[in-house]
Amino acid sequence: FQAEDGIRDRSPSRGLGDVYKRQDLIKNSVSSTFTSNVLTGLGSFGSLYDLKPLLNEYDNPVMVQSIDGVGTKTIIARKMKKYDTIGIDLLSAAANDILVMGAKPLTFLDYIANDKLDPKIIKEIVSGMVKACRDTGVSLVGGETAEMPDTYLPGEHDLVGIITGIVEKDKIITGEKIRRGNVLLGLPSNGLHTNGYSFARKLFFDVGGYDVSDHPKELEDSVGNTLLMPHINYTKHVLETLNAGIELKGIVHVTGGGLLENIPRILPKGHGVEINKDAWPSLPVFDLMKSIGNIEEAEMFRSFNMGIGMVFIAERDDISDIRKVLNGISPVYLMGSVVNGNKNVIIK
């Protein structure tokens, strides 16, 4: 057809294409996460995943799906000009959310939106996802990028991930088996993970007057590197414990709302928990933020994970076995117990 004079579409999305297809290095890197179950390569309209091989391992398989984002941690990445860890955060945050049901993560999809596409930054972000997917045994089966200058401010990014997993129906962990006398076992975090960043930025940068490059004596590293510590992925912790035949009555991923708001999500009616806050070591980043803002302890526990990234609820007799399974993987802190209550969390 011969072009005619008139208005033409010059929007950023037109002709942008898929960044994965345009960069062979990224394409090959992403493909390296594929298991034999993945039937389509990158660039297809959809991703095909063969379920038949899984049917031999499950009597009644149930799909578990979740969606999550990195939130304003991307602002720290932008300040640091360091984007290779927020892809790890994205996969870990999503995987941990389905692990609490006992599910094994299988596939992952990502969505990256920004004001203006920078292939170098996208490559860094995806490299983190690829590393996390390889470490977790998850196939990164597809992704979407969006360039929207009318929506995002210069330099802004938004990351969203969708994960799919599988669990045997009669082994789904719901928390309904939790009983008085069960114990709470804490798995340590390494920092904020992906929650509480708006509050943390206000404390460090607005109230404390710090820059990302500053290195307060209270921290082992700079403010920026401390805040960018990647979200721990607890896939190995959960699956190895379950594969050892140990029954976990409940699992909590400690995200926004901290221990105070996440533990009640899985407690049956008539149950609460008591937690000994001295049962695990405090992290310097939380101590410093508390000091900067003169923040009450209850508010800290409601805003941050306070050093515990995941909680197992189990029988007291299983403590030793769980510690044996996780020896060399993670410390396990006996942090409290289940008591009579109204889905309340008492921290002593």
What would you call each of these model-derived segments?
Residues 11, 68, 181, 253, ...:
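Residue-level signature of catalytic and energy-coupling elements of molecular machines
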Residues 110, 154, 193, 200-203, ...:
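Active-site-proximal loop/short-helix segments
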Residues 182-221:
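Acidic, glycine-rich loop-and-beta core segments that form the ion-binding/anion-interacting portion
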Residues 1-16, 20:
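Single conserved hydrophobic/aromatic residue that forms the stacking wall/gate
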Residues 23, 123-126, 197:
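Hydrophobic face of alpha-helices
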Residues 28-190:
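Glycine-rich phosphate/pyrophosphate-binding loop regions near the starts of catalytic domains
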Residues 8, 121-139, 152-159, 211, ...:
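Glycine-/charge-enriched secondary-structure boundary and capping motifs
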